[in-house]
Amino acid sequence: MFTSKSNSVSPSPSLEQADSDALDISTKVQLYGVLWKRPFGRPSAKWSRRFFIIKESFLLYYSESEKKSFETNKYFNIHPKGVIPLGGCLVEPKEEPSMPYAMKISHQDFHGNILLAAESEFEQTQWLEMLQESGKVTWKNAQLGEAMIKSLEAQGLQLAKEKQEYLDKLMEETEELCLQREQREELERLNQVLEAEKQQFEEVVQELRMEQEQIKRELELTARCLKGVEQEKKELRHLTESLQQTLEELSIEKKKTLEMLEENENHLQTLANQSEQPPPSGGLHSNLRQIEEKMQQLLEEKLLAEKRMKENEERSRALEEEREFYSSQSQALQNSLQELTAEKQQAERELKAEVKVRMDLERRLREAEGALRSLEQGLNSKVRNKEKEERMRADVSHLKRFFEECIRNAELEAKMPVIMKNSVYIHKAATRRIKSCRFHRRRSSTSWNDMKPSQSFMTSQLDANNMEELKEVAKRLSRDQRFRESIYHIMATQPGAPSALSRGGK
């Protein structure tokens, strides 16, 4: 019954580019081809072939011979055999006894159903799809579509405006967040610097404690030397007294010997006058010479003892000054140790405070980033409701509070130059104090170098080397820029800092 032809159904010109270019825009159709049609309005089993065209939302049909004219002229006849409006129609496949690829078109305003049939399943599917699509075009849908388009355009403009505003805010907040992230990285770097300075403080405190122990040992050695010198002074005093007593005895003996020599000479002279033989007097002269030699020896020993006493007195005085010097140095080291301990505790408190501030800043950053992500999701979401708008307003309020706090912190940081200026003044005063201390220590060192070294100095060369090493460490620390800046910061935060610091930090 079927006489199928491959060109019985032609696709829409929108599917064939060559045909669409050749047609006039007013004559373009969606689909055309030959279908089987059963008579409308009355029951009949007869099927006839007709040439059908789908134009917009209408189905036009002609006699089968019209197909050749349409394909030749590319214009359809404006006088069809019939026109079927497809708007609101229900199109569905249906199987008939003699037509397995039939299609039923029904509408509530139609007095019956319209039955059409294709010659293959492919043609049936193609016509069903195009008929169903054309059935969606109605006057009501057109009016509703125009109103919906206008409403969507207005909503789109409003959403685009809001999106642009939120994007501007988002860019500003992103820049602020980048600035906060940079500040957080700077805080981490400062934390590392503070950790290094804390380590330096601990090393300096340990060195000062070792130096204090060394000075204590030196003081004990000096005290022992002082005791030895005092004992030696006592022994020399006793020796001097003994020598003085011996000299006095020898003087008395010499005087007696001289008196005896004088008597002998007088006696010899008397005997000479009487022409008598003189007795020998050599023993007395030899005795006198021995006494004189012994007196000379005793005088030399006395001078030597006096010289040693003077040396001991000088050593005693030097040891006493040395003891006072080490006592002052020990007291200075003790004060420095206490100050460094206090500074270390202050630095630890500041470090803990900075860590706490950093943790609070990180928490606020996380909250701000979460609010920012939520706001971005709300902006990118196509579904808008009251709950999402309230959540977006809450996120915007949270970000507003966050950036207001950032502005207040920036205002506080703007006052930092005044504090730095005051810290420079404190640095100059501290430099003058350090120079004064170094000058006094240099003078004391010069006086010590001019003085004859004592036994304790002679036996403590290693301690002097330790002192020189400590001086070198102090010089290196004084040349360390970060160390000085941390010291100035600690001095600026001390309760005894100048009032200008407190005014600058308000």
From Swiss-Prot:
Gene3D superfamilies: Pleckstrin-homology domain (PH domain)/Phosphotyrosine-binding domain (PTB). It comes from Homo sapiens (Human). This is Pleckstrin homology domain-containing family D member 1. PROSITE patterns: PH_DOMAIN. SMART domains: PH. Residues 28-136 form the PH domain. The modification Omega-N-methylarginine is found at residue 503. It holds the Pfam family PH. Residues 146-391 form a coiled coil. SUPFAM superfamilies: PH domain-like. Belongs to the PLEKHD1 family.
